[in-house]
A protein has these predicted regions:
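Solvent-exposed loop/turn and edge beta-strand elements of beta-rich ligand-binding domains
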Residues: 1-177
Length: 177
């Protein structure tokens, strides 16, 4: 049996960070791929959403080459599934920057607010009622130019409860007179 991704998926994604500057910030989740999960929960297949096709077809934006309207779903799936470590962080940054550019018409699928107080030294934001899929999770307005480390992440949500960490540091404002 196959469980198709729909509103009934009702997944929860909890994003955490140890950086106190994230406290109280808004965090957005942008669905890049929808997901179909096997009945036993062991296999997940992803389908690229129409809104993200232009991102992958633009090699400068995504880093993926050779994507056309006909093959973009398969090429994007293959590309993203192989990303790890620093390459994954760099890709999440590019995707976040693309999503936050209003001209690209990528709407946040969900928005959450990071807790004002730390629990176990972590500040958390929880997204509830998510469809299964692959999400770009980022703090709006933060770009690689004004952060150190990771401020965006790419998360697979293919089960009821998923957790992820954002390991970057938001900048402090240094006012010089």
């Amino acid at each position: 049996t196959v469980a198709t991704a729909n509103a009934a998926d009702n997944a929860t994604l909890t994003v955490s960070t140890t950086d106190a500057k994230f406290a109280g910030k808004t965090v957005n989740a942008y669905k890049m791929f929808s997901a179909t999960v096997s009945g036993d929960g062991k296999a997940v297949s992803y389908t690229l959403t129409d809104e993200w096709k232009p991102f992958f077809e633009n090699s400068t934006a995504s880093g993926l080459t050779g994507a056309t309207n006909e093959n973009v779903n398969d090429k994007a799936n293959d590309y993203v599934s192989k990303l790890q470590g620093e390459d994954l962080v760099a890709f999440a940054t590019k995707a976040s920057n693309w999503a936050q550019n209003k001209a690209n018409n990528i709407a946040a699928g969900a928005t959450a607010t990071v807790s004002a107080d730390a629990s176990n030294d972590k500040y958390t934001a929880t997204f509830a009622g998510l469809d299964y899929g692959y999400y770009v999770v980022a703090v709006p307005g933060a770009t690689l130019a004004n952060t150190s480390g990771q401020y965006a992440t790419l998360v697979s949500v293919g089960r009821a409860n998923v957790t992820a960490d954002i390991k970057g540091d938001l900048p402090t404002v240094d006012k010089k007179v």
